Amino acid sequence: MTGLDRERIVDGAPALSAEELQAALAGLPGWQLAGDGKSICREWRFKNFKQAAQLANLAAWQAEAAGHHPDIAFGWGHARVSYSTHSAGGVSRNDLIMAARLDAATG
């Protein structure tokens, strides 16, 4: 999904179909559909707490800038970020954009 990280967040974006979502996730390595089928998530492993906190803070800063906020969990050596568009009742293109932005920022 080249360029997905440069797309605009759009208010009122609808939930994606299962087919659209699976195709999009193929272009976002490491991201997967959560068990509830209504969010995407990715987990990272780190060598210490500081690196996990840095990723959580990066995701938070990006979310504030875009006005689209994930669920973030982290602890010693791990972090998990989950995106969902609650108003759409599932995963929208906005969630994919934010996942791509986080990937682009983390290399």
Swiss-Prot record:
SUPFAM superfamilies for the chain: PCD-like
Domain of life, per the record?
Answer: Bacteria
What Gene3D superfamilies does the record tag this protein with?
Answer: Transcriptional coactivator/pterin dehydratase
**Family of this protein:** Belongs to the pterin-4-alpha-carbinolamine dehydratase family.
Tell me the protein's name: Putative pterin-4-alpha-carbinolamine dehydratase
Q: Which InterPro entries match?
A: PCD_sf (IPR036428), Pterin_deHydtase (IPR001533)
The organism's taxonomic lineage, starting at the top: Bacteria, Pseudomonadati, Pseudomonadota, Alphaproteobacteria, Rhodobacterales
Catalysed conversion reaction: (4aS,6R)-4a-hydroxy-L-erythro-5,6,7,8-tetrahydrobiopterin = (6R)-L-erythro-6,7-dihydrobiopterin + H2O
Example GO molecular function:
4-alpha-hydroxytetrahydrobiopterin dehydratase activity
| UniProt-listed Enzyme Commission number(s) | 4.2.1.96
Keywords (alphabetical) are: Lyase
Q: What class of enzyme is it?
A: lyase
